[in-house]
């Protein structure tokens, strides 16, 4: 008579509860981040800003994210990550709530700074916590599910920014997004669990995997990080400007442009992320380089589709965008898993913080503003087309990195 409740408790493990709460926070993180691109033409109109100035708003968020990453990573390897995750979620939620009272460009810029610091805290610790709950063989599956929140959150952010912003004013979607973030942060403080560091690690702790100095001589970590950085330059710039591009070049309204990008992102994001994770999981059984190789092919297939979006006939813009996003999302879980697997638990939070610093410093911190500056001097298609160069570089780095992929041991899974 008592076996059913016991079985239920077993199925709803601390790992599963923490995993679900982290997915919820990650979802809201990306909703908040992508409201700005969705509402960008509305905000630009009110502030009378140039494209370069609007790009600088996204740059501001990633710049402060990047600056906060080393300090938060250092803390995450030394103290409990649970209160730090909660603090980060509360900070970005309060900054988002405060957007309702923003009435000038520089006030919005300051808001972006606080959001960046809050997001850096969460973005570093969540993958590290999940890596301590789940062994190497299962991390690709777990992180692929976790990162599904990126396209879903981005799609909801685009849609909220464009549709709600057009109907009720661009401040409304920020206000609506802030409240759930505070609620889930409270739930995480109560129900989230802190796993023992390294409890699920089975890879040998070699010096270049388990020390801070060793990270800089760890080719698997460095190539994964720089390949992702070049990819992030393109993705960050494109995601910041794509609704505006469709509004200007495809003749869509602000609401329809944002809804179109949102719909494509959620379908491609879920399908691409889950299919990429599934293919990589099966490929890993026969080839330990699979995480890097799948990421390489994902980027290679994106390049011609992206060129068609920016420079092809208008009739092919939407189909090509659909194809490009699908291929791009294939690598979300595998590439992030490759980076997490390349380091040991004692320096994992530090490694993730270095990874985040690099992908934002060399990637999306400056790409939205650079694209805006090129657009002011030429047009937005040329600005976005420049990102294709960085996709080529990313593919080359990932192919080189596949030579250094660590061999994974067979391990038992923590079930979800």
Give the predicted meaning of each segment.
Residues 146-190:
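Helix-loop-helix hairpin linking two adjacent transmembrane segments in secondary transporters
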Residues 5-11, 195-225, 249:
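Juxtamembrane intracellular "pre-TM" segments in multi-pass secondary transporters
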Residues 48, 80, 101-106, 118, ...:
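Helix-breaking motifs and short loop linkers at transmembrane-helix boundaries and internal kinks
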Residues 36-37, 219-273, 332, 336, ...:
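Extracytoplasmic gate region of multi-pass secondary transporters
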Residues 67-103:
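Conserved MFS/SLC helix-loop-helix module at the cytosolic interface between two early adjacent transmembrane helices
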Residues 111-150:
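Cytoplasmic helix-loop-helix junction between adjacent transmembrane helices
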